[in-house]
Amino acid sequence: MNTASSQYTWRLAGPAVAVLLLLTFSVYHETLLYLTGLWNQLDIGEYAHGYLVLAISVYLVLRQRRVLAALRPCPNAWALPAVLAASLLWMLAALVDVQVLQTIGLLLLVLAIVWTVLGNRVTRALLFPILFIGFAIPVWFPLSPLLQDLTADAV
């Protein structure tokens, strides 16, 4: 593959993804505030590892710089339904006020945007680092008291 053409497409695709993600984060800022609020509750400690998970995800992306540089971003219009589905998931979760589903919808929206702009091959390389952020999402948060009781009874 021609590295000059790959660098040129990255010069277009990189800023495009960055702008789209910044717009997404500004539109869905309430979900981000909810997440960071949970991550900042150090006294509870259930999701205080969120910043660490985010840092590890960034590290995993940076570790793959050479692999990503060799790949050529190729937009994929077939991923647009995934953007729509993730947006609908977030919207439905917002309508019924289920913040956990909103955070999952936002994570899936980030993945769908990356897939749409960068294409299949680049998304395949970034799939694990993006989905790793899911460990910082409070999926088990509503079940924490029940799980704690079960653990206490077992011990």
Label each PLM-derived region with a short phrase:
Residues 1-155:
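Hydrophobic N-terminal alpha-helices or hydrophobic patches in metabolic proteins across all domains
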